[in-house]
Amino acid sequence: MTGAPYVHVGVLVHDLDAAIARYSLLGLTFMAPRTVRVERLVEGGRETALDLRIAFSIEGPPHWELLEAVGDGIYGPQHAETLHHIAVLHPDPVARRAELVREGFRETAAQYRRDGSLIVTYLDPADLNGVRVELIHAPVQDAILAWIAGEDAQA
């Protein structure tokens, strides 16, 4: 992933409001929490939809993303209270994912829009010394930055 910018660090938490209060003690300011509908999450051969409640730090990049645990998969409470992912911006995450799979990395989950376009893909943390990497596409990052700035954007 040479040259790929790290744009945010995601932390999965049990209680988003409590986590915001705690991280604020570090001098971070967070946007108001929002609920984001994930229309299509593909994980372990199954597809589901879910609502993610998240908040990003105003400070950054890299920003802090706090996500409230939900469901029984990659965002489930069994994965909470620890680093969830490091987001890496890539101009073509679909091609990059294919390259990394050829190199032996495994994808554990991916989010898609209704039209089938990729939002983010997650690499197996077992392939990176316990760190999950989220590959994120530039238009998604642009929407996140607009959202942090208070604009009404859809990531």
Q: What does each model-found stretch correspond to?
A:
Residues 1-45:
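Long, hydrophobic N-terminal alpha-helical segment
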